[in-house]
UniProtKB/Swiss-Prot annotation:
Matches recorded under Pfam families: Methyltransf_5
GO biological process: rRNA base methylation
Principal subcellular localization: cytoplasm
Binding site for S-adenosyl-L-methionine: 35-37, 55, 79, 101, 108
Name of the molecule in the record: Ribosomal RNA small subunit methyltransferase H
Superkingdom in the source lineage: Bacteria
GO cellular component, one term: cytoplasm
Reaction catalyzed: cytidine(1402) in 16S rRNA + S-adenosyl-L-methionine = N(4)-methylcytidine(1402) in 16S rRNA + S-adenosyl-L-homocysteine + H(+)
Top-level EC class: transferase
Database matches in HAMAP family: 16SrRNA_methyltr_H
Amino acid sequence: MSENYLHTTVLLDEAVKGLNLRPDSVYLDGTFGRGGHSRLILSKLGAQGRLFAIDRDPAAIEAARAIEDARFAIIHGPFSAMAEYMAQRDLLGKVDGILLDLGVSSPQLDDPERGFSFMRDGPLDMRMDTTRGQSAAQWLAQASAEDIAWVLKTFGEERFAKRIAQAIVAHNRQQPMTRTRELAALIADASPFRDKHKHPATRSFQAIRIYINSELEEIERALDGALTVLAPGGRLSVISFHSLEDRLVKQFIRQHSRGPQVPAGLPLTEAQIAAQYQDQRLLKAAGKMQPSAREISDNPRARSSVLRFAEKLAP
């Protein structure tokens, strides 16, 4: 596979800075991609520092093999399994920082053979890991209109989900779709209104990709795993690219950073509350950032990104 696709890492310095790196500590890049964050982390680690990286994309694993550094190790698999991978290395509760850069990467979008983009014709695949699971074409060929509409509405917030789903099923009864441009044209024809600022297939392609890769479930499992993997005082740095991702991250941090949930109106002193309601906070929210106008100008794909930080509290 050609790797001539340019990739500019979004919020590169900010995400790494948010880890509060210590030279001889252990870090985890849960989404290696093409290694922008990993390379910057390695440049700041000392001789005893270690960096583990995870990615389920075989092309990312191939790119990672170009890093010849004894402090670095790449793991092929989903980031949702980070707790399992770190347990195998006796590192549960010992990792000082985790970075997650969610969603699809520019090389994946720009490579027509991956099937993520409606702007370039290619096989209708959309799998992050091309070695397993069903492709988008395979799923669309056997899914009902009701199931397709639910996916488009739930993961793409597509207001014409039912019309588009019915058109897909009707087309596939005649001849199953196998190409991205074919699907994009069908969605455009089925959409009664056009947004001049957005291609009519944008939301549907996002929704199908999220469903095929179980992206939101993967994020939920990864965030839960991060709590187990992080050492006390360890930092979590997460970049999201659309509202569904960011909502999960925001809710997770909020859920684990709230103090004791005490029913309102109880006639208790602070000392009594402390004695009866255990403080179960596991995280401390540590800030939020968005890209600068300059970064958005240089890299328009950064426009929707949000970076959130959290810190694991000592027990």
